[in-house]
Amino acid sequence: MSLLTEVETYVLSIIPSGPLKAEIAQRLEDVFAGKNTDLEALMEWLKTRPILSPLTKGILGFVFTLTVPSERGLQRRRFVQNALNGNGDPNNMDRAVKLYKKLKREITFHGAKEVALSYSTGALASCMGLIYNRMGTVTTEAAFGLVCATCEQIADSQHRSHRQMTTTTNPLIRHENRMVLASTTAKAMEQMAGSSEQAAEAMEVANQARQMVQAMRTIGTHPNSSAGLRDNLLENLQAYQKRMGVQMQRFK
């Protein structure tokens, strides 16, 4: 799984199901594909979204700022700064500084995520705030590791509050990952289709997958329901890849 796919999976796992989730998923895909380069307009759009908690908006704003190239002097947004101040708790700030020093030494995504997971959500948010406010710099990979650790903690607490049985992998994250991978695979199919004889069929399968993912995000479904989506898609993809003679990305 690529780094950006992983980031998209974790970020989307903390957003409540509904039309807005499908819209945010599309924005993230566009940003990661380099199709949306207007950071100012993106932040203005994010600021006015309903439903999202201030912290979720702060995390999304942080991810957009990390990813979209912008002019150096571009103003930092107050709604992101307020969300990433660790509730104004000095303890959170102290821990955030300690974490930041550790993240400076981590250059990999997984290393940073591992280190960050041992801190509280408040400390993690404060640490993002430090980086967002240009008070410190870490590698983009380390910053994304910090983002995913924060999302994992939020998703864990949401999952516990759903009173579902905890498994080794968080079902909300696993569910979102299946949907992100379905979208990614659909995109890959469209690109590969080209002018081959099976192009129309490939586009049809990809389109069905995309519509299904969008519907599931809009309506909201039980975390286990995406397993069916995965199985249906796999059947279609395996039939398609036999004819194309290629190996498609497998689902987890």
Curated annotation (Swiss-Prot):
Disulfide bonds: none
GO biological process, one term: viral budding from plasma membrane
Keyword Membrane among record annotations: yes
Subcellular compartments: Virion membrane; Host nucleus
Membrane-topology annotation of the record: Peripheral membrane protein
Highest taxon, organism lineage: Viruses
Transmembrane segments: none
Region (RNP-binding): 165-252
HAMAP family xrefs: INFV_M1 (MF_04068)
Purpose of the protein: Plays critical roles in virus replication, from virus entry and uncoating to assembly and budding of the virus particle. M1 binding to ribonucleocapsids (RNPs) in nucleus seems to inhibit viral transcription. Interaction of viral NEP with M1-RNP is thought to promote nuclear export of the complex, which is targeted to the virion assembly site at the apical plasma membrane in polarized epithelial cells. Interactions with NA and HA may bring M1, a non-raft-associated protein, into lipid rafts. Forms a continuous shell on the inner side of the lipid bilayer in virion, where it binds the RNP. Determines the virion's shape: spherical or filamentous. Clinical isolates of influenza are characterized by the presence of significant proportion of filamentous virions, whereas after multiple passage on eggs or cell culture, virions have only spherical morphology. Filamentous virions are thought to be important to infect neighboring cells, and spherical virions more suited to spread through aerosol between hosts organisms.
Protein name as catalogued: Matrix protein 1
